[in-house]
Amino acid sequence: MTGNDTVGKLVDLGSGNFAYLQEGGSWGWSNAGLVTSEGVSLLVDTLFDLDLTRQMLGAFGAATPAAARIETLINTHNDGDHTHGNQLVPGARIIASSAAAEAMAAGVQPGTFTQLLDNAAELGDLGTFLHRNFGAFTFDDIDLVLPTETFVDKLTVTVGTKSVELIQVGPAHTPGDVIAYVPEDNTVFAGDILFNGSHPVIWAGPPSRWVDACDLILGWDAETIVPGHGPMATNDDVRRLKEYFLTLIELGGELRQKGLTPWEAAEHVTSRGMWPTWGESERLIVNFASVYQQLGDEPTFPDPMDGLTAMAQFSVAHEPKETIS
């Protein structure tokens, strides 16, 4: 049972489509979607732990009988907050890009989160950060179920009489990011290509690929956009995110030329009050590191855990002190 009382909010998108939004949209608090037609459904992503996924499936089930017949599950990428509940959708086709499936198999497993949290008191700033951001989740009993089908570039699947277009736009946030687009309803499930109201995090990059992904979404002029984190979005939100990356690329080039490290570049941005309402400013460190890599530097954080540790140190340095009991 999750230790956090946050309950997601069901949003009826019309035309038989639904979103499930988790309040805040911070680390681990992701969104999901449901597309229905002719009494069957397609689920876009599961959540970070089993209890949260059960709550989400229950909300969809209360909203539409079609939720009882989930024929297809799309994992938009490999992160656990979009895949850890896969086991609760038995019998469904599970589809992801080939790159996402490979990253799921090779990446951080649910048990690793448990081990890190159990030892948080001994991990310094990293432990404080993990306790603060992931302590509300329970990773026990998760059996990570991998995709049963994969694709490269594009794939069209059907749910009832509707077509759902899956477009691989990664590597960007992660190696194999996928956007799900429902042309009939002009609805986009953007996965973590869209963080609404917080800094995104570039685990893979390059950031220029993320700009291209924003352009793809804007080209649809979608009526409905479900982000991977945060509240329902508009095309203006997508434009803001595109401008964010364009600014990071330009500013990162200037700061790199001046010899600033990614940490110092992040300090430069936060000290000037850029994007003051966006949460998770610690992500600027890995984002600038990705910009520097795109400009020719060797990877600053070849191991993702190194990047997470740097973000933890930055976050703890800029937040009130916390004691882990």
Regions found by a protein language model. Name each.
Residues 258-325:
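C-terminal regulatory/interaction regions
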Residues 44-46, 69-79, 95-97, 169-170, ...:
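Active-site neighborhood of phospho(di)ester-bond hydrolases with catalytic His/Asp-centered motifs
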Residues 187, 209-271:
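Divalent-metal (often Zn2+) His-rich catalytic cores of metallo-beta-lactamase-fold enzymes
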